């Protein structure tokens, strides 16, 4: 049986790439925090954002652009914005 090709979307790929860079930047800033307790607190709070980003990226890599893609991106962006509001970094 032929494997179904996943649908690609260049604009969505740019959004995923931008999201990746944002996650990497925040992680780098968290790793630069000297106080271990504060670093753990920030990391714990940011784990949800990383989890949502990983889910978004994996869904796109496996299934391509689909009905759920925009919802996953919105969930990631909401979590990222909430983190930025609650934690100064």
Protein language model regions, located:
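Acidic, low-complexity, intrinsically disordered interaction modules
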Residues: 37-73
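Compositionally biased, low-complexity segments enriched in small residues
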Residues: 3-5, 11, 18, 43-44, ...
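Generic L/I/V-rich hydrophobic alpha-helical segments across diverse proteins
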Residues: 16, 20-23, 42, 46-49, ...
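A structural signal for well-ordered alpha-helices, especially hydrophobic packing surfaces
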Residues: 27, 34, 50-57, 80-87
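N-terminal acidic leader/helix
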Residues: 5-37
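Short intrinsically disordered terminal tails
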Residues: 1-10, 85-89
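Amphipathic alpha-helical binding modules
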Residues: 68-89
């Amino acid at each position: 049986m032929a494997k179904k090709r996943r649908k690609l979307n260049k604009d969505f790929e740019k959004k995923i790439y931008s999201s990746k860079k944002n996650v990497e930047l925040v992680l780098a800033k968290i790793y630069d925090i000297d106080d271990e307790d504060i670093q753990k607190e920030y990391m714990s709070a940011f784990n949800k954002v990383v989890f949502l980003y990983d889910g978004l990226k994996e869904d796109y890599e496996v299934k391509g652009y689909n009905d759920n893609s925009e919802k996953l991106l919105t969930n990631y962006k909401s979590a990222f914005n909430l983190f930025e509001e609650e934690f100064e970094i």
